[in-house]
From Swiss-Prot:
This is tRNA 5-methylaminomethyl-2-thiouridine biosynthesis bifunctional protein MnmC. Its cofactor is FAD. Keywords: Cytoplasm, FAD, Flavoprotein, Methyltransferase, Multifunctional enzyme, Oxidoreductase, S-adenosyl-L-methionine, Transferase, tRNA processing. It is found in: Cytoplasm. Catalyzes the last two steps in the biosynthesis of 5-methylaminomethyl-2-thiouridine (mnm(5)s(2)U) at the wobble position (U34) in tRNA. Catalyzes the FAD-dependent demodification of cmnm(5)s(2)U34 to nm(5)s(2)U34, followed by the transfer of a methyl group from S-adenosyl-L-methionine to nm(5)s(2)U34, to form mnm(5)s(2)U34. It holds the Pfam family DAO. One of its GO terms (biological process) is tRNA wobble uridine modification. It catalyses: 5-aminomethyl-2-thiouridine(34) in tRNA + S-adenosyl-L-methionine = 5-methylaminomethyl-2-thiouridine(34) in tRNA + S-adenosyl-L-homocysteine + H(+). In the N-terminal section; belongs to the methyltransferase superfamily. tRNA (mnm(5)s(2)U34)-methyltransferase family. GO terms for cellular component: cytoplasm. Residues 1-241 are annotated as: tRNA (mnm(5)s(2)U34)-methyltransferase. It comes from the Bacteria.
Length: 676
């Protein structure tokens, strides 16, 4: 359901990889690299176009990633371009590729050894290789961003969605010959390629098959034959000479990029959502100013001493599972990046244990196991195996996430913000912004002292206080109080090797081997931040009751070491929404949308035109991360930055719809329910 089938290959006499699934070579027996350069780079006139290109990023899409040779070759070419023309407008290459049967890491490495000139790029690509999960995974290289979509292109290409209409500059139509892979080469594919191509966008392909040529012409391309590579007589290339703009299929969820004139962006917040949004914006060259109402950063929901880091693998909506797995993998990338930059924070990639402590949790974990995740992501363990993983006896089975971890959120956020200041981030603390007003093509921010600050774009990332503004007051967000207990360690508790999750969580000892974090309460619509003796007791009772053993021979004495008597705890107020899914994107104009869509149920039924969603211009938000901010913030921040800059988005359209800030009232309106 979520995982994809790996490729099966062998090397022929010419040492060329051959697919067992398609009984076809991945590239020419003569010279795969020369073929790639001739067919795809020259066929799309890349170098000549880059020299005169006036935008900041160029987008290439490819229909079959295969060995990654096309990616390595064009990334190397773009690096040469940037080195030769560092002051030209074009700064970044986006490479979108689709792959139904991904090659395992060891086979990629074996094939790439044929091309030692790409050894550094190949190593970075192979280091990124994690589990191939249905959907998009984003990987960053020096000058290139790779969006690798795993799964059938017939399922994934439509998931680029309304947003990507007219945004792709060039296509590499690859993916085995049409006679060997007829399921891919079809009229629907050609129509979608045309839909996503920019006016004057191009394609190139190794084939000259009549059905392919006619299909591309029928879709709207002007198609030319050119000399084929090597022994092939001909191949095809073409251009989209059209400025046609089709109506969006889902206009009520259509995201809108910013109108960027000066790239002057303000972020209101001070936690992990603000951090990763600022990081992604700074990497794009933005001038970013952060406004935080507290004297220090990370004093609210991002301020715990230790936090658990792992994906949510069970949900009634598979979109949420896919989102959290992709977010987890992306966050792993970013954490490794932070470590390489020398950003100091306590952490331990010790794995996370999920306990089947009652019938409901056992059913939930059984459902997770049924998805057949790879063992590197999730392992189903009996109670003896789970006990061994955590280092303490348990009387229940469960699951284990080997790549899970604990880290120190406050330390990470504060030190990472200090690093971002070196990249140009301006931080203004003790600045509570009380009002937003859009005038003269910019946002005017007003603080409690009635001082004003002007910025072109604003991102709201201030947790449950997102709704403090007139523009956001109708968003159905609410505060959730959470108290995390800090308990002393003991000889028994020092044996805990992994994060332990039940109807709460217990972390291993901190780096000083002095204390553990025990969490956490969950009180809706409560933003009080005073210590609660009752919640402290409940944190203790949850672990002792959930994990208590009925086996008198089982030594569970370690549970009695959970000592809350010092009454040390930290209280934070998280931001949540009823469906417990984050929100990210444009700030919707509630009143205008209710007016435009008051009759949307009948408009859809009659197939009448529906306007695009009304949004507040250049105003964005990221929020409702709940207790999953460590996992979700990095990918959400990257997606939001990509949206602001009109770049490809690293999430499928169905997931983006599920993250849309207006989803609560749009779902009602689509059913014909009146919104007041």
């Amino acid at each position: 359901m979520f995982t994809v089938t790996p490729a099966k290959i062998y090397l022929n006499q010419e040492k060329t990889p051959v697919s067992e699934q398609f009984n076809d070579v991945y590239f020419s027996n003569q010279d795969g690299l020369a073929e790639s350069e001739y067919v795809f780079q020259q066929g799309n006139h890349l170098w000549e176009r880059w020299i005169v290109y006036q935008e900041k990023h160029f987008v290439i899409a490819e229909t079959g990633f295969g060995t990654g040779l096309n990616f390595l070759a064009v990334t190397s070419l773009f690096r040469q371009f940037r080195q030769q023309y560092p002051d030209f407008p074009l700064k970044r290459l986006f490479f979108i590729s689709f792959e139904k049967y991904p090659l395992p890491k060891d086979q990629l490495q074996q094939i790439h050894r044929l091309y030692p000139q790409f050894s550094a790029l190949s190593q970075q690509l192979c280091d990124y290789c994690l589990d191939a999960i249905q959907g998009c995974q984003r990987f960053h290289f020096a000058e290139t961003t790779l969006d690798l979509w795993f799964g059938d292109i017939a399922d994934n290409l439509p998931q680029l969605g309304d947003y990507m209409q007219n945004r792709i500059d060039a296509w590499f139509l690859d993916g085995f010959s049409p006679s060997k892979n007829p399921q891919m080469w079809n009229d629907k594919l050609y129509q979608q390629i045309f839909y996503y191509s920019k006016p004057q966008g191009t394609f190139a392909t190794f084939t000259a098959a009549s059905a392919v040529r006619k299909g591309l012409i029928s879709a709207g391309f002007e198609v030319q034959k050119r000399k084929g590579y090597g022994k092939k007589r001909e191949c095809l290339c073409g251009i989209k000479n059209s400025t046609q703009q089709q109506n969006a299929k889902f206009p009520w969820y259509l995201n809108q990029p910013a109108s960027l004139l000066s790239e002057d962006i303000a972020i209101i917040g001070g936690g992990i959502a603000s951090l990763f949004t600022a990081l992604s914006l700074l990497k794009r060259g933005a001038k970013v100013t952060l406004y935080c109402e507290d004297e220090q950063l990370a004093l609210n929901a991002s301020g715990n001493k230790q936090g658990a880091f792992y994906p949510q693998l069970s949900d009634d909506d598979d979109r949420n599972i896919r989102f959290y797995v992709h977010a987890f993998f992306y966050a792993l990338q970013q954490l490794q990046w932070a470590i390489k930059q020398g950003i100091e924070f306590e952490h331990e990639f010790c794995g996370v244990a999920l306990c089947a402590y009652d019938h409901k949790s056992a059913v939930k974990l059984a459902k997770i196991s049924s998805y057949q995740w790879s063992k590197s992501l999730y392992q189903n363990l009996n109670k003896e195996q789970l006990s061994e993983k955590i280092g303490l006896p348990l009387d229940c089975a469960g699951g284990f996430i080997p790549q899970g971890a604990w880290l120190a959120p406050r330390q990470f956020v504060q030190n990472a913000f200090s690093y971002l200041q070196q990249l140009g981030l301006e931080i203004k603390t003790s600045q509570k912004i009380t009002a937003l007003d859009y005038r003269n093509l910019q946002w005017v921010l007003t603080n409690e002292q009635n001082e004003t600050f002007n910025h072109q774009v604003v991102v709201l990332a201030n947790g449950y206080q997102i709704t403090d503004f007139v523009q956001t007051a109708k968003l159905p967000l609410y505060p959730v109080r959470g108290q995390v207990s800090q308990i002393p360690t003991s000889a028994n508790l020092l044996k805990l090797k992994s994060v332990l999750c039940y109807d709460g969580y217990l972390t291993p000892a901190d780096k000083m081997k002095q204390s553990h974090c025990l969490g956490a309460s969950h009180i809706r619509n409560n933003k009080d931040r005073h210590f609660s003796h009752q919640e402290q007791r409940e944190n203790q009772q949850k672990i002792q009751q959930n994990l208590a053993s009925t086996d008198t021979d089982k030594n569970m004495d370690w549970l009695q070491d959970i000592d809350i008597s010092a009454n040390i705890a930290r209280i934070g107020v998280r931001c949540s929404v009823r469906d417990r899914v984050p929100i990210m994107g444009n700030v919707p104009h509630f009143e205008q949308q209710c007016l435009d869509y008051r009759n949307i149920f009948n408009l859809r039924r009659r197939k009448q035109p529906i306007p695009d969603a009304a949004q507040w211009k250049n105003l964005y938000l990221i929020g409702a991360l709940g207790s999953r901010g460590l996992t979700s913030a990095a990918l959400l921040g990257e997606t939001l930055a990509s949206l602001i800059y009109a770049e490809p988005l690293p999430l499928s359209e169905d997931i983006l719809h599920n993250l849309s800030p207006n989803r609560s009232w749009i779902r009602k309106l689509l059913k014909g329910t009146e919104i007041k």
